[in-house]
C-alpha cells in the first residue's frame, strides 16, 4: 500500500527524507497519503492550503479532486476562501459557533450577511470553478 501511495502522490524522490526537510507542498501530499493508508471513506483536511505556495495549492486542489473522483468524502476547514470555494460542491460557513450559511459557493458569495461578517464587500468569487 505504501509503495502505491508514494507513487500516486509523487513522493518516491523524498521517501528517505526527514519530515522537517520537506517543502510545504511535499508535507501536505505526505499528510494526505498517510491519511489514505487505511482506505478511509472520509478524510478531514485541516487548513490544507495554509503555508504553501500557489503551485502547491493547485497540486493539493488536484489531489482533492482525485479523492472526490474515488468517492472519498472530504471535509475541509480552511481560511483560504478562494482556494477552498474553487473546489467545493457544498460549503458551510461557521460563525460564532454555528453555521451562518450553507450552500454552493455562489450562494455564499452572494449572501449579504456572509459578506458583512466574513468575506468582505469587495470579495469576488473566481469566475470559473476549477475542474481537474
Region locations from a protein language model:
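Conserved ABC ATPase "signature" region
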Residues: 1-14, 61-65
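Conserved ABC ATPase signature
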Residues: 18-22, 26
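Hydrophobic anchor residue at the start of the ABC signature
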Residues: 32
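Conserved catalytic motifs of ABC-family nucleotide-binding domains
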Residues: 39
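Catalytic Walker B motif of ABC-type/P-loop ATPase nucleotide-binding domains
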Residues: 43-47
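A short, surface-exposed alpha-helical micro-motif characterized by mixed small hydrophobic
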Residues: 84-86
Amino acid at each position: 500500500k505504501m509503495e502505491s501511495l508514494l507513487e500516486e502522490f509523487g513522493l518516491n524522490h523524498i521517501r528517505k527524507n526527514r519530515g522537517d526537510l520537506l517543502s510545504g507542498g511535499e508535507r501536505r501530499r505526505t499528510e494526505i497519503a498517510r491519511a489514505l493508508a487505511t482506505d478511509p471513506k472520509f478524510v478531514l483536511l485541516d487548513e490544507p492550503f495554509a503555508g504553501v505556495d500557489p503551485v502547491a495549492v493547485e497540486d493539493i486542489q488536484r489531489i482533492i479532486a482525485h479523492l472526490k473522483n474515488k468517492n472519498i468524502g472530504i471535509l475541509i476547514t480552511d481560511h483560504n476562501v478562494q482556494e477552498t470555494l474553487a473546489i467545493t460542491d457544498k460549503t458551510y460557513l461557521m460563525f460564532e459557533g454555528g453555521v451562518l450559511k450553507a450552500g454552493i459557493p455562489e450562494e455564499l458569495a452572494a449572501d449579504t450577511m456572509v459578506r458583512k461578517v466574513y468575506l468582505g464587500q469587495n470579495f469576488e468569487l473566481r469566475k470559473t470553478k476549477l475542474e481537474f
